[in-house]
Amino acid sequence: MSSHNARILDQFTRQAVPFSQSPSVSNQKALEFIVSSAGAGPDDTVLDVACGPGLLVCAFASVVRHATGIDLTPAMLQEARKAQHEQGLANVTWDHGDVTTLPYPDAHFSIVSCRFVFHHLQDPLVVLREMARVCKPGGRIVVADMAPAPDKVNALNAEEQLRDPSHVRAMPEEELRGLFTQAGLPEPTVGHYRVECELDDLLSRSFPNAGDEQQIRKMFSDSIPSNSMDLNTCAQG
């Protein structure tokens, strides 16, 4: 196993329960926005790549024929199975695996999605090409991730790498769009949605190195006057 995958396993094994319970992660309107943007319907078969606790898979499963989630972290898949059971969904499959080499045939799914993942990938183009490989001709590929402004991306990445050591690099929207071109895909349709999150909630599902929390809090506070991390951070109370 690569050292980066080891960091992923370490972080997301510990994050599995708090991540799945976070209001910002489980935001129903955000999940519905992705499902709607994908044009999902009763004839679709869906793959969600690096599915985490399965929230998006379950959202898709309520409207499609079948939904599959794959993830590297067994603890995340355990939370995903709990979510499936709680929602009474029978049309779901969970697979354990590395998303850089998806264990599915070519042209197998009509929708292939990926949420809050690309900033954790060392080579997102490899994963996008795999997503394209397993997607049927005429299917839809959906990538949802943070997309900071070009002049603010470095500040955001510095904070995120401190908060979550498995974070690699968030990309500006133009760079994300460029990945589709490099993967031989059509120009993507771009939509935006905003999810609000309390800093305490964010830190409760993060496991930074010992002693770094105060520095992270200061980075958020210092970013407020100029919105230097492009997170629209504000102070309350």
Per-region residue spans from a language model:
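A short acidic, Gly/Pro-enriched loop at the edge of an enzyme's catalytic core
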Residues: 100-111
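Conserved Class I S-adenosyl-L-methionine
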Residues: 53, 124, 187-237
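A short glycine-rich, Lys/Arg-flanked "PGG" loop and its adjoining helix->strand segment in the class I
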Residues: 125-137
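Short alpha-helix
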Residues: 169-183
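Class I SAM-dependent methyltransferase SAM/SAH-binding core
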Residues: 47-49, 53-101
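A short SAM/SAH-binding and catalytic strip from SAM-dependent methyltransferases
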Residues: 110-122
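Conserved class I S-adenosyl-L-methionine
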Residues: 1-41, 55-59, 76-79, 86-87, 142-167, ...
